[in-house]
């Protein structure tokens, strides 16, 4: 399966996983690591509140789960899919993991670090830049986040 054919299925799966995060009180963000054929190797959602660890963003957990499952310390040739533009911490993890392609949904002008904010992958401090594809299922992902925060205000 090519990455382009897998996009709707993967993003739909991530939106479901992000909804599960919201149902447990977490910010609705989910991430998946896929192989070159588009098969999901690892799937994760935000678990910061659940685990009591501020570092447990979906991207970090998905990358760690994929590395553990594969017995590798890098993910060359693998892709990361996420419902929200990654923050600086997650962008750093993506670079260190050597992710091949990054696909994300909603843009995050406040805390995002890929196309917004510090634009981590464009900085001299970044030693690996994945191919970046933003805006996948952007409307659905943004609406999910907006609904979550509207309930808490």
Stretch-by-stretch model annotation:
Residues 1-24, 86-153:
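Zinc-dependent deaminase
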Residues 4, 48-49:
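A short, polar/acidic, helix/strand-boundary loop motif
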Residues 29-38:
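Short beta-strand scaffold segments in enzyme catalytic cores
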Residues 72-84:
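Immediate flanking context of iron-sulfur cluster ligation sites
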């Amino acid at each position: 399966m090519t990455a382009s054919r897998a996009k709707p299925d993967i993003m739909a799966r991530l939106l479901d996983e992000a909804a599960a995060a919201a149902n447990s009180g977490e910010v609705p963000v989910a991430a998946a690591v896929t192989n070159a054929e588009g098969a999901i190797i690892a799937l994760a959602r935000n678990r910061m509140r659940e685990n009591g660890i501020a570092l447990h963003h979906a991207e970090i957990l998905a990358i760690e789960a994929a590395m553990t499952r594969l017995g590798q310390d890098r993910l060359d040739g693998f892709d990361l899919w996420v419902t929200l533009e990654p923050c600086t911490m997650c962008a750093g993890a993506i670079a260190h993991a050597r992710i091949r392609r990054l696909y994300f949904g909603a843009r995050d002008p406040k805390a995002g670090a890929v196309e917004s904010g510090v634009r981590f992958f464009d900085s001299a401090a970044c030693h690996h830049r994945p191919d970046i594809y933003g805006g996948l299922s952007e409307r659905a992902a943004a609406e999910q986040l907006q609904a979550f925060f509207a309930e808490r205000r």
